[in-house]
Amino acid sequence: MDIRLKLILAAVILFMVGLPVSGILRGTKPPPPDPDLAKIAEPLQNPQARSSSDSPQQITKEEMVFIPPGEFIQGTKQGGFNERPERIVNLKGYWISRYEVTNHHYLDFVEQTGHRKPGPPSRYAKRLAQLRSPNQPVAYVSWHDADAYCRWKGMRLPTEAEWEKAMRGIDGRLWPWGNSPRIFKANLGGSEDGYEATAPVGSFPLDRSPFGVYDGFGNMMEWVENWYEEQAVNLNESREANSADRGGYKTLRGAGYTSYGIDLRITARSFMVPDFRDETIGFRCATSKLDKNPNDSLL
């Protein structure tokens, strides 16, 4: 190849390589931002989720559901070692939150008490944008945060047995809707259910227990009051009985929006140290005070 041809070829290569560089140097207008980044848990088309036409400005009111006294089936024969055995448990009547505690209501608590704001370490702050709309369940709260909120409301966290009865009913079903593990009935792992992250509370009509309590199976795992007891048969519903010297872990119930697995059931149990905070963990409150309707004092 002669010198002249080489020079022409080199000039063509430099011209082609220089196009994108010159665009940057001249301040070429960048492409429009991905609209998905501006959306916060916007639902996809899914018949199991509520219509996206619901006003995002309408705040979901805190509401308590009364769970009547009596027996229910706790545990299961089909589950893991910490879910067995299946047994009959008798509870007194109590009230429990219909929905997981939302960002709106938790931030009211923060503003009025000066309590720590919910949120991840700064390196994960970008992720928080998907979790912060008013009607989404509050995330990044420790057991201590959840306990403080419920006490501020004049309530407490539910016990394991109270949580399970409220989410399951009394007939031993394995999911809030029955005994069929069908997909898209709750906000679990993946976006096929209609949400990339958490959904506004109560978005899945089928993730509703026989008592009318929402999101027990999906959306967020939830702190309960008990210290974790590996052998479920040894659970003592006297809330003072399970102490930190029995392992130092608090119990988590339910599944979350990142949970996968065909073996997920409403009876599943997990645990974590009480000062742990994560985007998959939230909570709800309960009370055994039966002298008045707690809904009368909720905003």
Where are these regions (language model features)?
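Disulfide-stabilized, aromatic/cysteine-rich ligand-recognition loop
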Residues: D2-V12, M16-K39, A49, P137, ...
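N-terminal low-complexity, Pro/Thr/Ser-rich intrinsically disordered segments
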Residues: D36-K61
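A short glycine-rich, aromatic-capped structural motif
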Residues: Q57-P121, V141-H144, G218
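Short coil/loop residues immediately preceding or within conserved phosphate-binding loops
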Residues: E62, E86, L91, S133, ...
